[in-house]
């Protein structure tokens, strides 16, 4: 009886170890993982984000853009620096406002569509994630973003963003997808300038996805 009990325990132990080993070795399909992560973020009603863009200029690495933003429905607010200047903007539906960095007064753009096109990546970070084709998607490993475990995927897509296509080429994307809910939480985009072949890197991070965010028009 004792031997039978011992063998039973050993058998249970082997099954449990096999299950844990199989779970640790299991890897998701990278294309499905990326597709699901992009779709979840594109359909999110709200989120907060950061955007940092580096570019080599005259042989030196320059930070062109460094902003914090939040988006709720059709409304967006950003705060940070672009090309060395302070920027604070609010987009409410079809209206866009900018705070003068010197007198701190808000002004409303007369031509809101033109302003939104110029600041497309900053006011709508998801525009940088629009793709015609994903291309080959590779699962390069696992990592950690802000204390959360993620899958890391690499791809060289065909982008669907006119502004990006005009100035950049050879796009390489690295996507960080949270394991717990398959949500896309970080993206690194690398590309080369079409005119000079200088490298560019853009990093996007997303948080508070789906949470309530209140964005209102400023007093002008």
Where are these regions (language model features)?
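Extended lipid/amphipathic-ligand handling interfaces
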Residues: 36-39, 66-73, 93-94, 173-179, ...
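Acidic/charged, solvent-exposed loop-and-adjacent secondary-structure segments enriched in E/D, K/R, S/T
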Residues: 99-127
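Short loop/turn motifs at secondary-structure junctions and domain boundaries
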Residues: 81, 133-134, 165-169
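Beta-turn initiation residues at beta-strand->coil junctions
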Residues: 51-55, 80-83, 100-102, 188-193
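A short, amphipathic edge element
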Residues: 28, 128-139
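N-terminal leader/targeting segments and the immediate start of mature chains
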Residues: 2-75, 212-220
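Gly/Pro-enriched, hydrophobic low-complexity segments
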Residues: 149-220
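Short, hydrophobic/aromatic-rich segments at coil-to-beta transitions
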Residues: 44-50, 71-79, 146-154, 162, ...
């Amino acid at each position: 009886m004792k031997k039978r009990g011992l063998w039973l325990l050993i058998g249970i132990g082997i099954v449990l170890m096999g299950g844990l080993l199989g779970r640790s070795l299991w890897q998701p399909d990278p294309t499905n993982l990326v597709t699901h992560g992009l779709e979840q973020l594109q359909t999110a009603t709200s989120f907060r984000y950061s955007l940092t863009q580096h570019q080599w200029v005259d042989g030196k690495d320059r930070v062109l853009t460094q902003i914090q933003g939040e988006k709720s429905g059709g409304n967006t607010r950003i705060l940070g620096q672009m090309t060395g200047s302070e920027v604070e903007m609010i987009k409410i539906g079809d209206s866009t406002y900018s705070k003068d960095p010197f007198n701190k007064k808000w002004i409303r753009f007369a031509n809101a569509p033109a302003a939104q096109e110029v600041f497309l990546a900053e006011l709508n970070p998801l525009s940088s994630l629009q793709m015609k084709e994903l291309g080959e998607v590779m699962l390069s490993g696992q990592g950690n973003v802000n204390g959360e475990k993620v899958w890391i995927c690499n791809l060289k897509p065909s982008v669907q963003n006119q502004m990006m296509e005009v100035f950049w080429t050879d796009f390489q994307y690295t996507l960080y997808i949270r394991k717990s809910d398959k949500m896309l939480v970080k993206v690194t985009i690398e590309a080369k300038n079409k005119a000079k072949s200088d490298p560019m890197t853009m990093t996007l991070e997303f948080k508070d996805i789906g949470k309530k965010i209140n964005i209102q028009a400023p007093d002008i």
